[in-house]
Every structure is written in C-alpha cells, then in structure tokens.
Amino acid sequence: MSNIHPTAIVDSSASIHESVVIGPYSVIGPEVNIAADCELRSHVIINGPSNIGTGNKFFSFCVVGEDTPDLKYQGEKTTLEVGKNNTFREFCKVHRGTGADLGYTKIGDNNLIMPGVMIAHDCVLGNNNILVDNSGLAGHVKLGDHVTLGGYTLIHQFCQLGSYSFTGLGAQITMDVPAFTRVAGNPTKQAGLNSIGLERKDFSKGEISNLKKAYKIFFREGLKVNDALGKIRSECEQNDSVQVFIQSIENS
C-alpha cells in the first residue's frame, strides 16, 4: 500500500497489484482490477468494471472506464478491457461498452493514446496504434494494428480502419479505411498507399511494390469491388500483406 498516495481514493472492491503506483488525488472505483507495474499519475480516474493489464501508464486527468453518455445505455453492467504496456496521456477519455452492442470496450497492447483523445463505447483497438492529440472515436469503431491517427481525426460510428492505415491531420472518417492505405483532406479522401509508414515498419521493397499494384487495381481502375478483388488475386503475389488488404475490404 506504500505506492498509493494518501490523497488517492481506492474502492474496497478494487483489486490493485502491490507494484502499482497511484498518484495524488486519483480515484479508483469499484470492480477495477489493475495488474502489475501500472503507474497512475495525479488526478487519474478509473471506474469499473474495468480490467487493466500489466505495464500501463495513465497520465494526469485521464478518465477511463466511465459510463458512456450514449442514450442507449441504461446502466447495464458493461466492461472495459485494457491489455498491456499502453500509454494514456493527459485528458484522454475511454468509456465502457453498451448492452446494445459488444458490452465492452477493448484496447490491446502497446498503444499510444495522446492527450485529449476520446475512445467511445464498444470500440475495439488492436496493438501498436498511435492516436495523436484530440482524435475522437465514436461508438463501435474498430482499429486494426499499427494504425496512426493524425491529430484531430474524427471517426464516425461503426467505421473500421485496417492495419497500417494512416489518417492525415483533421481527417473526418465516415467510411471504412482499408489496411495499408492513407486518407487525408477535408472532405477526406483516399491519398495512396501508406508507403512511408510501411518502410518505417520494415516492409520490404517487394512487399510495398506488390501492395501498390493491388492498391492501383482497386482504387484506380474503376472496377467493381468483386472484379477488382478477383484481379488482385490473379495478378498480385498472394503474400500475407495482400491477404490482409483483401480481407480488410471484404470485411468492410
């Protein structure tokens, strides 16, 4: 208990690993489970039911695991599930799920959630994503892995962003974004393959070239969806990355 500041408030039903550090004026509500090696700076609020994995860091004035303001929510028991080694910077907000959909909000591992980011009810985030300052995810949004949201990106309900996709500053996402692609501008439009991001993630030149070919077939040749996917299957090397690209479109 020596790692809990005397001004912090921890509900008696919360389960806190002995290695967790809880800073001044933080509040941990009922049915919150926090695993080892987490750190809460000052004025952090975590409500439950919430399960927080190992090695997460919460900076000042985060509000995590709170009831959603969605009007469908009628006080039913829902949860927040957080994986390991995520960073939640100042003033970000994460709401639990609703009974009308998943019943939970889920965040994977190694995500960087920057100041002012809003993650609404029933969202699902994969791993290694970067959500830049003041991005907003409406309810039911899904992100794959290694997604980067530019600052002030707004994502409409039920949209899906595939792995390794990238959004420009102030993008307004109202449709799904396929894996490996970039969107930018206002109104927001496709802006090409996320080539620089793929290079930084150590994709080979051959993989990137193959994805560019698939991208051009789908977005530049004016084909119907099924025809474009058929042409990608017949003319592009069917490696893992192309399969992910195809699946992100088929699951849209």
Report the location of each language-model feature.
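Terminal amphipathic alpha-helical/low-complexity segments used for targeting or macromolecular assembly
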Residues: 1-7, 12-13, 18-19, 55, ...
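Structural signal for interior beta-strand "rungs" in well-ordered beta-sheet cores
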Residues: 3-189
